[in-house]
Amino acid sequence: MGTNDLDIEEGTLEIGMEYRTVSGVAGPLVILDKVKGPKYQEIVNIRLGDGSTRRGQVLEVDGEKAVVQVFEGTSGIDNKFTTVQFTGEVLKTPVSLDMLGRIFNGSGKPIDNGPPILPEAYLDISGSSINPSERTYPEEMIQTGISTIDVMNSIARGQKIPLFSAAGLPHNEIAAQICRQAGLVKRLEKTVDLLEDHGEDNFAIVFAAMGVNMETAQFFKRDFEENGSMERVTLFLNLANDPTIERIITPRIALTTAEYLAYECGKHVLVILTDMSSYADALREVSAAREEVPGRRGYPGYMYTDLATIYERAGRIEGRKGSITQIPILTMPNDDITHPTPDLTGYITEGQIYIDRQLHNRQIYPPINVLPSLSRLMKSAIGEGMTRKDHSDVSNQLYANYAIGKDVQAMKAVVGEEALSSEDLLYLEFLDKFERKFVMQGAYDTRNIFQSLDLAWTLLRIFPRELLHRIPAKTLDQFYSRDSTS
């Protein structure tokens, strides 16, 4: 009998019993008959005829029949020599503070030639449900160093907000930049609190890549190592040539690690998941293999619920210092925001950051289009005591002026520049400078929130005071004057 390397708790099932009752293989699934007492989500060890072993998980139970998804793929599995051992345990992952600075594959095994992890605990990758009354409302801003996000789509600690991208757009570069620069806002007037709860030592990043190619994986590894941010990053890599089924457990292992770092070690964890479109495709593949009734575009009808089991693991808990903030990244097929993956993601998450192809084609980096972007929890993360008292008003005025500038630009294409008023020309000037100076910044150009707000005021001073309708007179008195040192 094969030995089981997972923690086994005693149950009604006879632990370690092996079966040679494989009746069929369908895609990533193995079907077994005559199994005594199989449990949903139970882990099984599969030994092939050549002696190699694989792991799987029970997906469906029907009497004595069990359907098992194999994490390493079903190639080489036959019904004559393959034995399946039921462990009586759900899938658990070892967790430890030592996981920071390490690189793992999609199943949570180290691939950086380092020593094995000495686990401080084994945790169920599905996570434990959080009592809604114990959740704390997300507050305090996570600073990304990117002006369009920090000023106009501020991310609160404990929020979940996705990046909507598409093929060929620089979402990987933006994700790497956020990893390099992300941290809590440093407020000089609260130095004691800053050291205790907001220090860089208390900030960690868990990065999970699903279905990425080798070039992308090397890009992230090299970027983290060269920029010295690797020591606070835990990296999980599921490559495009790894088994598709592994993509279903990769984000869950990453989030289980994040939960341990946040709620047991008191760290503020930023979880970046890329690419959730690959995850959804893996879900569709398993659903098709199980011959389930397909939903929109072949995706399973339960995909909304399944995505929610990942996204809803972000947040803060009463009485715990740590927090989990999620930034999932997904690529929209054919730039279609109505595709099921971005559509359902937008319903669950608290806003979105939209990466725009037109801005990218005009050599503007990062090509974040602020008009379709939104952060629903922004108001709780900004303002006096958290960022600056003018933050909300400046953001509203930038949105208003940029939207008017876009309308004027469209009108100019119809009637020509000669037909525009002097006021319209101001909006056109603002539009150009906003994109070239505010939106555009280097991949290694870090702007703190105060620098970004000052830059925003520089742009708003293009207009006379009477055109800044969204900003109260008191705020204008303090910040509008050109020699203001805010």
UniProtKB/Swiss-Prot annotation:
Molecular function terms, GO-annotated: actin filament binding; ATP binding; proton-transporting ATPase activity, rotational mechanism
GO biological process terms on file: actin filament bundle assembly; actin filament capping; ATP metabolic process; glucose mediated signaling pathway; negative regulation of actin filament depolymerization; regulation of transcription by RNA polymerase II
Signal peptide: none
Claim: Acetylation is one of the keywords in the record: yes
NCBIfam families the UniProt entry points to: PRK04196.1, V-ATPase_V1_B
Compartments it resides in: Vacuole membrane
Family recorded in the similarity comment: Belongs to the ATPase alpha/beta chains family.
PTM annotation (N-acetylglycine): residues: 2
Any single Gene Ontology cellular-component annotation: nucleus
Gene3D superfamilies linked: 3.40.50.12240
Protein purpose: Non-catalytic subunit of the peripheral V1 complex of vacuolar ATPase. V-ATPase is responsible for acidifying a variety of intracellular compartments in eukaryotic cells.
The protein's assembly and partners: V-ATPase is a heteromultimeric enzyme composed of a peripheral catalytic V1 complex (components A to H) attached to an integral membrane V0 proton pore complex (components: a, c, c'', d and e).
Domain of life, per lineage: Eukaryota
InterPro entries on file: ATP-synt_VA_C, ATPase_a/bsu_AS, ATPase_F1/V1/A1_a/bsu_N, ATPase_F1/V1/A1_a/bsu_nucl-bd, ATPase_V1-cplx_bsu, P-loop_NTPase, V-ATPase_su_B/beta
Protein name as it appears in the record: V-type proton ATPase subunit B1
Keywords: Acetylation, Hydrogen ion transport, Ion transport, Membrane, Transport, Vacuole
Topological type in the membrane: Peripheral membrane protein
PROSITE patterns (alphabetical): ATPASE_ALPHA_BETA (PS00152)
